[in-house]
């Protein structure tokens, strides 16, 4: 953001963060929160730290103007890691916080090969039970850089073995399917040719029953544990 001077979740072509997470080899479920501050005097290192701390504080306690999305992302107990980055020049600060749910020890990392998507891994926390594998589609648009938040787009398909099926989206039958509290193993065909960014998201149920109060429509106990995005041109 500092390089392009564009304060947005989206890049200038309208692509959201999940594609860049995948490109960098990050396959866990992640959510990004960003903050910006400007100073009319040159910034020192200590001042930059203080302002960054205030940006983080406001994301939790003064987030009404942003619909409390930052607050709920930062406090959601689904996540067990946070990656915090700060970039700045003489009078601008850009803060990027990525919350990560890293609970899979990969045996075979998620990948696309010969038109098929596959993954295999061990769950490191048996409180998380895999539930749904949903595919979303988002269409990149340059004017999205003005949006205050980002999304994965609309659900277009779900992966599930017979005899189950999805009513409102396409149902894809997997070649391999194991979903339990110890091992996840999936392989299924990809059938998407319409231009867009597709995100494969594995949802899980969190059995820990941690009590907290989201201010948004976020569902308590429903956690993403794997996310893989790819671009169809």
Model-derived regions, located:
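Short, compositionally biased P/S/T/A/G/V-rich stretches that sit at domain boundaries
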Residues: 89-91, 97-125
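Conserved catalytic region of serine esterases and O-acyltransferases that act on ester linkages
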Residues: 119-124, 144, 178-180, 192, ...
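Acidic helix-start/capping segments at beta-turn-to-alpha-helix junctions
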Residues: 1-5, 15-18, 149
């Amino acid at each position: 953001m500092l390089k392009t001077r564009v304060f947005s979740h989206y890049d200038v072509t309208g692509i959201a963060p999940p594609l860049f997470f995948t490109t960098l080899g990050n396959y866990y479920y992640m959510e990004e929160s960003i903050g910006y501050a400007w100073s009319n005097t040159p910034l020192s290192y200590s001042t930059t730290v203080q302002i960054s701390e205030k940006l983080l504080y406001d994301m939790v306690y003064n987030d009404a103007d942003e619909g409390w999305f930052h607050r709920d992302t930062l406090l959601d107990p689904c996540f067990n890691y946070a990656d915090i980055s700060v970039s700045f020049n003489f009078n601008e600060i850009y803060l990027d916080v990525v919350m990560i749910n890293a609970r899979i020890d990969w045996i075979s990392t998620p990948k696309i090969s010969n038109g098929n998507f596959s993954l295999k891994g061990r769950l490191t926390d048996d409180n998380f039970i895999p539930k749904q594998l949903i595919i979303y589609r988002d269409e990149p648009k340059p004017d999205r850089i003005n949006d205050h938040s980002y999304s994965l787009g609309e659900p277009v398909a779900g992966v599930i073995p017979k005899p189950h099926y999805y009513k409102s989206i396409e149902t894809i039958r997997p070649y391999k399917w194991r979903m339990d509290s110890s091992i996840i193993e999936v392989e299924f065909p990809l059938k998407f040719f319409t231009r867009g960014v597709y995100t494969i998201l594995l949802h899980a149920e969190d059995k820990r029953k941690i009590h907290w109060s989201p201010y948004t429509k976020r569902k308590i106990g429903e956690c993403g544990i794997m996310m893989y995005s790819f671009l169809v041109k």
